[in-house]
Amino acid sequence: MSADQRLVATSAPRRRVPAALAIGALGLGLLATPSGLAIAKPATPTQATAASRQAPDSLFPEQGSSKYDVKDYAIKLGFETSGDIKAKTTLTAKAKKSLTSFSLDLEGLIVDKVRVNGRTADFSRRDNKLIIKPAKTVKGRFSASIAYHGKPVTHIDPDGAQDGWIPTDGGAGATVLSEPVGAMTWFPNNNTPRDKATFDMKITVPSKLEVAGSGDLKSVRKHAGKETWRWVQPYQQATYLAMISISDYNVYHSTMRTTTGRKLPIWSFIEPKLGTVADERALIPTIIRYEERRFGPYPFNSAGIVVKETGVGYALETQNRPVFDGVPDDLTNVHEWAHQWYGNSVSLTNWVDIWLNEGFATYAEWLWDASHGGPSTAETFQKEYDSHPATDPLWTPAPADFDDPADLFGSQGYLRGAMTLQALRQQVGSHDFFIILRTWAKQHKYGNVTTPQFIRLSERVSGQDLDAFFKAWLYIPKKPALS
């Protein structure tokens, strides 16, 4: 999925176009198998309030809640090759005020029992909300455990794409790809990127299967024809970036040194019929070090890739370990790794700011291409600017001002987002531009951001008034004039 492929249509394609062919040469020992086992509107608020069912996201206002912050998710999930799961998710959270009830996002699945602070709680379902009424009003820090089972559904996005729980291997496997809201198909959660948390996932499968995950691999425990894979994410992670992928994989383990000398384990999971994918695996250390020199230190403790024909037609930057639908090309690899800085460590507050993810990752492709015999970023910018007339769909809607969630993965976030960054570079100069990129990654590491924050940083570093510049490039649905 090269940059050109992704920008053929207005509906940009890192997420919407099948991964392209690649090249394949590094490999270190196989691991082996894992095991598996199958696993309404609130009452009228009083002084002790019912938690809002919604977090104020402009594109997905029905998702998430703003009345509490989740600190950690502990997920125990058993999977059977029938496609059924049996699971328990325990979350630790902090209520922002006393709550008589609160809600989590959950699509499909059958809830068996809910406990809050160790006591059985009442619950009900409304649309994709699990509404929980504790036996006692929740104050401050609290825990909630939800036991559930069933066959997870696949969520259909507003643009028609699939996300969430994706059955593979004829239903005998599965891969989780949750951007933007698919996380609710496999565990109950506060499904908004503004509420990041740490994760501890224990996934039990039949011993003939392996489990890839986001985070760091802590253990693989064998027991009675099953294996339990434990993946721990010690850093803040948005719910859509939590990933598991269950299949018959070849597992490759190696290590690398970052530019700061840190030793980084690399765990990659490759579908056997796709070969060893050696070239793209070998490229991981090179890409990470390349991006470190431009964006700052790699923000996580491990790396790797998952290469699997999922049939969804897109790759996703799941934290630590991107997932590719088939063997990726170099630029797709570069794109997904750039997201570890911009999107995963530095995360959105509101989905309307998706350009802060996709524009940055697309610009990383331009940088890589320019450093490896391709056109300069200025040449790429000019080519794209000249080849898209004022009537082209690229220019509408604006990257940071649209209201249709079906436009979330349109080219305004990818291509026009990258063009905005190059235009900024030409406006403030390369020196200040790269200070802005590195400061953005450092200042907001593991946090959440908005477009106005990026504008303020750019003005502070450059000493320029950039209001008119950013208004033209990000907020007006028309082709910006070049100064």
Identify the role of each PLM range.
Residues 2-7, 15-86, 169-171:
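N-terminal, polar/Ser/Thr-rich
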Residues 87, 192-334, 363:
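Hydrophobic helix-coil surface modules that form long, contiguous segments used
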Residues 88-109, 187-191, 199-206, 452:
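Surface-exposed beta-strand/loop patches in extracellular or lumenal glycoproteins
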Residues 106-167:
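A surface-exposed beta-strand-loop module
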Residues 138, 148-199:
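Glycine/proline-rich low-complexity spacer/linker segments in large multi-domain proteins
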Residues 410-483:
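Amphipathic alpha-helical substructures
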